[in-house]
Regions:
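Membrane-helix interface linkers and caps
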Residues: 1-6, 28-90, 102-119, 143, ...
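Transmembrane helix-loop-helix hairpins at the membrane interface
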Residues: 2, 13-14, 18, 121-305, ...
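Alpha-helical multi-pass transmembrane bundles of energy-transducing inner-membrane proteins
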Residues: 7-8, 204
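Hydrophobic core of alpha-helical transmembrane segments in multi-pass integral membrane proteins
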Residues: 17-27, 56-65, 93-101, 261-276
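Select subsegments of transmembrane alpha-helices in polytopic membrane proteins
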Residues: 20, 86-95, 160, 257
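C-terminal TM-helix exit segments that contain a strictly Trp-centered aromatic cap at the helix terminus
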Residues: 24-30, 98-104, 218-226
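Mid-bilayer segments of alpha-helical transmembrane spans in multi-pass integral membrane proteins
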Residues: 89-102, 128-129, 133
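C-terminal ends of transmembrane alpha-helices
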Residues: 100-110, 164-173
Length: 313
């Protein structure tokens, strides 16, 4: 009965949180932006900037409103942390760059032309950053956060990662075989777990957004598919082709589906999980090791509830 009541509470919170997020973003796109366009004359480029910045601002406001209004707590995960954000971006870019360098060295990826820096890349970078932040707000901030406070860090991580993976399968489902889609599903779960662990270790949405965006933009710069999307490849400094089987190159989904990348991501996730299990002493439902805490286990509806034992994997 208790678990059923908890599940109902989780479902209600998710409905409220995502209704706020969706409503804020759509309200800006369908109501506020057209009103601004009526009042002020702007060219296509300026309108695009206003649209992206407005969507971002509304999403952040919706998240802030949910946390302050429904969770009744400070929004610590949106506090600025310049050094940690920089480190997150460097870690994200370096991780996927290492995998792609190996794939280029093995001949799985071949650069066919050097186009140099393209004028549209700055706009792509901004779009990637906004998309990464929206995903982090939705998946790590809301979905993972609500699940974690109900059932603990590790169950929440895997549940959220399954949803994250499922939502990305559509990117390449019409161009991939069943085996390739299964590989993509596993890759998506691992990436969801990786970004969850980055968030768990930092408790900062800006840091995990920087990691996520830098990871994605590095893939774009190499001229290979990004999560099954080819839209930005013509703007990449490198024109690249993938040659070889799907397990080696990632095929139409890109380097995230390559076995090498999946192995690296899995190793990072396992290392962070083990480090957390060995070092995180749980006190009042929240770790005392890092600021704001790392792990929550069986915290129920009160993240500052009774002390819990050390996490056991």
């Amino acid at each position: 009965m208790l678990e059923f009541q908890r599940a109902k509470t989780v479902l209600l919170k998710l409905l409220v949180a995502f209704a706020l997020l969706f409503g804020a973003v759509q309200g800006f796109r369908l109501l506020l932006l057209p009103a601004l366009q009526t009042l002020f004359t702007a060219d296509a480029a300026l309108t695009s900037v206003i649209r992206r910045c407005g969507i971002l601002a509304c999403a952040l406001f919706a998240y802030w409103a949910y946390v302050r209004g429904f969770e009744k707590r400070p929004v610590r995960e949106l506090r600025p942390a310049p050094l940690a954000i920089t480190a997150g971006a460097l870690f994200g870019a370096a991780s996927i760059a290492l995998c792609m360098l190996v794939l280029f060295a093995l001949g799985a990826y071949v650069a066919t032309a050097d186009r140099g820096w393209q004028g549209g890349l700055a706009g792509v970078a901004a779009l990637i950053l906004i998309a990464a932040l929206l995903e982090e707000i939705a998946y790590r901030g809301l979905l993972f956060g609500i699940l974690e406070r109900a059932w603990g860090t590790l169950p929440a991580m895997w549940l959220q990662s399954l949803v994250f993976s499922a939502m990305h399968l559509a990117n390449a489902e019409d161009r991939a075989s069943t085996v390739e889609l299964l590989t993509t599903a596993v890759s998506g779960v691992l990436l969801g777990a990786l970004w969850t662990m980055v968030y768990v270790y930092t408790r900062n949405l800006w840091v995990v957004t920087a990691h996520h965006a830098a990871w994605n933009f590095t893939i774009i710069l190499a001229g290979v598919p990004l999560s099954g999307l080819d839209d930005w490849r013509p703007l990449a400094p490198l024109a690249s082709e993938y040659r070889g089987s799907h397990w080696l190159t990632g095929g139409v989904f890109g380097p995230e589906d390559a076995l090498l990348t999946m192995a690296l991501v899995a190793a990072c996730v396992i290392a962070m999980m083990r480090a957390g299990a060995q070092s995180a002493t749980i006190e009042n439902g929240v770790s005392v090791i890092f600021p704001r805490g790392r792990w929550v286990e069986n915290a129920g509806e009160n993240p500052r509830g009774p002390a819990s034992p050390r996490i056991a994997l």
